[in-house]
């Protein structure tokens, strides 16, 4: 379960942000996660309260936005959304594709309590 270590790294990063802004506590954390990131969302959500215990992040809300899987076809140039189990161009059927989005795990925003 690498989701716990992902949470620990996330909490460390968020705490550094909170401290650098003089925050007393973190209210919410927003992530953007792609379907090809390798992260199991239920496990990440389950690990979050345990990883944040005893930190400025404890008790904060974790919001997760799913990033659509988008590919660019190198044969015809079409950029489109596809399913993770069907990595081919929707227009020409080519397998010569490049993933444009859907692999990311990005910290989008942190809401802080400063007073």
Curated annotation (Swiss-Prot):
One of its GO terms (biological process) is protein maturation. Gene3D superfamilies: 3.30.2320.80. Ni(2+) binds at residue 2. Zn(2+) binds at residues 73, 76, 89, 92. Signal peptide: none annotated. The keyword Zinc applies. It comes from the Bacteria. One of its GO terms (molecular function) is nickel cation binding. Keywords: Metal-binding, Nickel, Zinc. Pfam families: HypA. PANTHER family: HYDROGENASE MATURATION FACTOR HYPA. Belongs to the HypA/HybF family. Involved in the maturation of [NiFe] hydrogenases. Required for nickel insertion into the metal center of the hydrogenase. This is Hydrogenase maturation factor HypA. It comes from Nitrosospira multiformis (strain ATCC 25196 / NCIMB 11849 / C 71). The gene is hypA.
